[in-house]
Amino acid sequence: MAARSELLRSAFGKASPSLGWFIVNPHRYSYRWWHMFLIMLVLYSAWASPFELSMEKAASIALVVIRPSGRCLLRHRHCHILLRHLVTGKRQGLWGLLNLLRLWRLRCASKLFARVEKDVRFSYLWTRLIKLLCVTLFALHFAACIYLWMVFNYKIKELTWIGSQIHSFEDRSVWFCYTCAVYWSITTLATVGYGDLHATNIGEMLFSIAFMLFNMGLTSYIIGNITNLVVRETSNTFKMRDMVQWVSEFGSMNRLPEVMREQMLANGQLRFRTKEQLQHEHVKRIGPRGMVGEIGVMFSIPQPFTIRSRRLTQVVRISHIHLLQAVRPNTADGCIVFSNFILVSDFVEYLESLKVQTKEVAFVSGHL
């Protein structure tokens, strides 16, 4: 209920009532900072979960002292024996794969990137680039851990990709094996293929085939996103080039003087350079948030959100013409209705000046 009340706060324009200490408000700064801290833990889980599965020496081993209260029994049921071997086996059997279920938490990171991309305080370009970089690094790390997992779970170590090149690699450090796995993973992802490391058994060959298929999809995704970002960033440049070309062709076709051509080019360049600044100035001149709707109603522009109600209300939708026909006979009610749209004394003068500026711009563009 707290989340719904906070979501409706911006629509009604008033803050929700104070909540109790036992209610978690998702819009408080403390909750947001805690959520950001959880994102850091999610990133650590994304790195540690595959790494602990592939390298047993990297996982921390806790000391647990157990004193059995009963006697040692001989289990003869097949289901009990199977369950015991799954839980207490050398590599914990299938239970080790359940550690990868923590990767489901990555959806929180995906939601974070989706929220940051919509935030105007952050650059959309750098946000997308960081997201693509994180996806690439996670793919490299996950593939390297799978390669290591296949090596340590294969019976004949000499018939693995690292055992055929480096003898007694099990005695080497954890980071040495991980570095070799990342090296092979990144050479496979980059389609370099030096040939020093290669698959030597059927399992490694099958995984290499699946990894290359995933590599083609990931490469297409990255290239498509980067192309979209480059086109988005260079769209204004291409518009300016088209404008310069159009002005040059227009001047040559109509045999305009060189001075007039330079003035037209300078005017166009000034418009593109000050486009962002003029947009900010236009927003400042509009003033309060409700004035936008008032201007739209005065110019008979349909508004998508015209009514907001806090209680059960019956709303009748009529056109601008029918409203004038209903208000004109009742002068007192008409003054009250239209006074809601005109909040300042200079508003009518501002609309008249806006109309004059619109006519001047239309005349200049029609003359050109």
Curated annotation (Swiss-Prot):
The keyword Transmembrane helix applies. PROSITE patterns: CNMP_BINDING_3 (PS50042). InterPro entries: cNMP-bd_dom, cNMP-bd_dom_sf, Ion_trans_dom, KAT/AKT. Residues 180-199 dip into the membrane without crossing it. One of its GO terms (cellular component) is monoatomic ion channel complex. Gene3D superfamilies: 1.10.287.70. It is found in: Membrane. The chain crosses the membrane at residues 33-53, 97-117, 132-152, 206-226. It is a multi-pass membrane protein. GO terms for molecular function: voltage-gated potassium channel activity. Its main location: membrane. This is Putative potassium channel KAT5. It comes from Oryza sativa subsp. japonica.
